[in-house]
């Protein structure tokens, strides 16, 4: 065969039997019913249906997901939750509207601000000093912002966060609906939660969930749900703007099979995973429910040096999802066996874990000088951080922690933000620069 560098690299790594504590949720184990993908890789034909026209077997499969999540409608996404967030904000807002945005939102939400020319009012989260992460969104803070900015049309938040922090979605929905607004939830990391209990996801008007992150489904497979005013036709129209006109049939079939698999035995496996994570949280320094409401399966280890802890795990062929200066984030799923957890526990005994460093709370956001749209589409250049003072950021400067942009697109880089970034060690990384106009 001709030279195949990517395929060779992937197969060589897989052959090393890495313990995959990262997404995708299938962990490299066979996906149910998908032994011969080529046999079901079709295009839009009368027997196979059309994702963006609705109906048929695709529509039936989507309706079963909607029923499972207790939502009115569901649309399969083959462009990941990024496609879903863009589509959801397209439905929730008209160009030029004002949106209340969780400042810790995924970059797809920031791109939606620019593409739709939305005006952001940023919503801060409380800083949990001992845990070294941001906490849940406060309904009281949302109420304050809606009173101060009655022009807000929608609230877009992330729940759960990368660190597994959950917000009170029923309370947030009540506040938004009382003010006539729309609740958009980026639940990319929470597709598994309905199999573990009621976490309020169905209170959202628009909900995005990444099956590939925490369920046995292939990369990029995700789901967009709606309630109330947003019909299935609305979902199809908005998602088709950002998705391929040739969506993958094997990927859509995998979503169908994933749901059936979870109902047949995956739920029991996920409950076992939650029990294993609870046990590890007791034995090793980690975020717990004493810090904040958490996804019961997200394992966030605490360490004096998160990057060193990550390297120590990787040296034992255990591969985390990510690390920051004080944490290592692991994503156990229903695909992880008891022997996988035993292997993880043995590896953790060789890692220096302990309280995370005392990171300061994020600074007050800088002045907004341009809209996100103006910032994204303007010419740009790169400057070292210390030379960027007074310039306008064209992209996020978002170190972990805190996991939220210290400087958002369109904001002016100021002394206070530079000092904070240096304080948390952002400038110690190689070749750090900020894009400016």
List the predicted regions and their residue ranges.
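Conserved PLP-enzyme active-site core in the AAT-like
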Residues: 2, 6-11, 32-33, 53, ...
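Conserved N-terminal alpha-helix of the aminotransferase class I/II PLP-enzyme fold
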Residues: 38-80, 104
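N-terminal "arm"/small-domain region of PLP-dependent enzymes with the aminotransferase-like
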Residues: 1-56, 181
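Conserved C-terminal alpha-helix-loop-beta "cap" of PLP-dependent enzymes
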Residues: 285-409, 420-426
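Charge-dense polyanion-binding interfaces
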Residues: 428-437
